[in-house]
Amino acid sequence: MSLRPLPLLVVPGLLQLLFCDSEEVIHNTESVDWEDRTVPETLVGNLFHSRITSPLRLFVKQPPDPKPSYADNTKNFWDWLANITEIQEQLARTKRRPIVKTGKFKKMFGWGDFHSNIKTVKLNLLITGKIVDHGNGTFSVYFRHNSTGLGNVSVSLVPPSKVVEFEISPQSTLETKESKSFNCHIEYEKTDRAKKTALCNFDPSKICYQEQTQSHVSWLCSKPFKVICIHIIFYSVDYKLVQKVCPDYNYHSETPYLSFG
């Protein structure tokens, strides 16, 4: 028995009927309203767009923002730094200096502000100081001095037993009972130096270089304490000064201490 290949009969009308039936099945199962679009209407395109309406809207890439310039970055940095610095200073003042509205913390010592001005041929010195009572048993003393010319300046807090002298003697180094109970220490210190040109004092026709120094010192004191004094040491080419200033026991006085040398 021999097998013979059967001929394949192709009926064009039948294939067209099958193709149309399959397309109708897809439309009926999806039940999606079609929209007008520029995509070629093919079977694959119909299948893709029937599931996602306007798919290009979901993947639209926004245009990139213009890159900020160097000046904009610098301005933003300084604005941020100024805001951060202002916030930190406010927090520091809030922690260290609580608001006290009662009158009993108004005056703790006989003076509040300190001012000293020293002028010589070689140096011009201005020292200012201020006491701030925190109301919680502690207080701060802030010093600032500006000098123009040549010289060394030292401003500090000492107990009343501190000896006023130019040279340090062996007796002055001995600690007394009062100095041991002196609970004050430096909390902050900063010094800035610069040079400028000006007319010479000895010869106005010439130009001399002058050194400018600005210092900020902050002291913090706590109990127990009785009396504190400001100790100033100043050395220059033509002038020497050692001065101790103590507060007045008449704490009702509102007049600040003024010293001119």
Curated annotation (Swiss-Prot):
Region (II): 23-87
Stretches assigned to coiled coil: none
One of the record's GO cellular component terms: extracellular region
Name of the molecule in the record: Neurexophilin-2
InterPro entries reported in the protein's UniProt record: Nxph, NXPH/NXPE
Keyword DNA damage in record: no
Native source species: Mus musculus (Mouse)
UniProt similarity note: Belongs to the neurexophilin family.
